[in-house]
């Protein structure tokens, strides 16, 4: 529950920032500004306050890392992510024992792409009307669903959504595809959503039209090959990044619905 950490009465400002980075995985200054509503100066102060827990540059990175982003691929300067000590500190704050690893630098585009979906929605919808679950929280929700149904979880169909978005009374599973996953992994995720037997729409966001069309075709072929006997399948909506916002916020949409 990302937004509950903002101005949390039990945590200091820099601790709130640590909890927010823990939930987001990785984020740049612009994303942090939008999510928190804090000034850029406050964001910088909070980051430096966290890093000050370490004495050497290496120890500072154990608390929060600054990951440079190539200017040719992004106008952003750096992305921030918690290091090993930062993750452990937040888990103690939250009284969580679950395993969490550092966000891999190789997935920086993926994390920022997921966060951008939220940022675009926040530009249209008040924060108090939003619920945003991280991948870990969305996965935990699925686990609780399996347990509530008293069904044995089939590992073949177990999925880890990128996020779950709630806007007032509407809910969506969110998947950001950065054109890195192969057909086999995507098909496995498609099967996972079918076997959820859940009516929540799945929104796929791709970096370009070519990738969006590929995902759409792959989903069509999966349905035709495995679920053509009138078996219920979830709504799958496919968008180029940025085009999903009107659909999610119920404005005029350019969705490709299958």
Where are these regions (language model features)?
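Non-catalytic C-terminal interaction segments of nucleic acid-processing enzymes
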Residues: 9, 15-18, 29, 180, ...
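Short glycine/proline-enriched coil/turn segments at helix->beta-strand junctions
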Residues: 37, 167-170, 196-200
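Amphipathic coiled-coil/heptad-repeat helices and related helical stalk/stem segments
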Residues: 43, 114, 159, 186-189
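Amphipathic alpha-helical dimerization/coiled-coil segments
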Residues: 88-135
């Amino acid at each position: 529950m990302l937004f509950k950490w903002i101005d949390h009465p039990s945590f200091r400002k820099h601790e709130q920032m640590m909890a927010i980075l823990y939930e987001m995985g990785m984020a740049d200054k612009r994303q942090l500004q939008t999510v928190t509503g804090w000034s850029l100066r406050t964001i910088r102060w909070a980051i430096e306050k966290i890093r000050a827990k370490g004495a050497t540059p290496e120890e500072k990175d154990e608390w929060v890392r600054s990951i440079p982003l190539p200017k040719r691929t992004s106008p952003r300067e750096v992305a921030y992510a918690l290091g090993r000590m930062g993750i452990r500190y937040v888990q103690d704050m939250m009284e969580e024992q679950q395993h969490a690893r550092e966000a891999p630098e190789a997935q920086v585009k993926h994390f920022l792409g997921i966060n951008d979906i939220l940022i675009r929605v926040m530009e249209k919808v008040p924060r108090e009307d939003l619920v945003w679950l991280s991948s870990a929280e969305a996965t935990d929700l699925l686990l609780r669903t399996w347990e509530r149904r008293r069904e044995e979880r089939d590992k073949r169909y177990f999925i880890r959504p990128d996020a779950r978005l709630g806007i007032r009374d509407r809910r969506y599973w969110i998947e950001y595809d950065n054109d890195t996953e192969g057909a086999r992994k995507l098909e496995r995720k498609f099967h996972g959503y079918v076997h959820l037997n859940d009516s929540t729409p799945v929104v796929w966001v791709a970096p370009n039209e070519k990738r969006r069309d590929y995902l759409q075709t792959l989903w069509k072929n999966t349905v035709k090959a495995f679920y053509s006997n009138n078996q219920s399948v979830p709504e799958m909506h496919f968008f180029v990044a940025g085009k999903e916002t009107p659909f999610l916020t119920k404005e005029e949409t350019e969705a490709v619905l299958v």
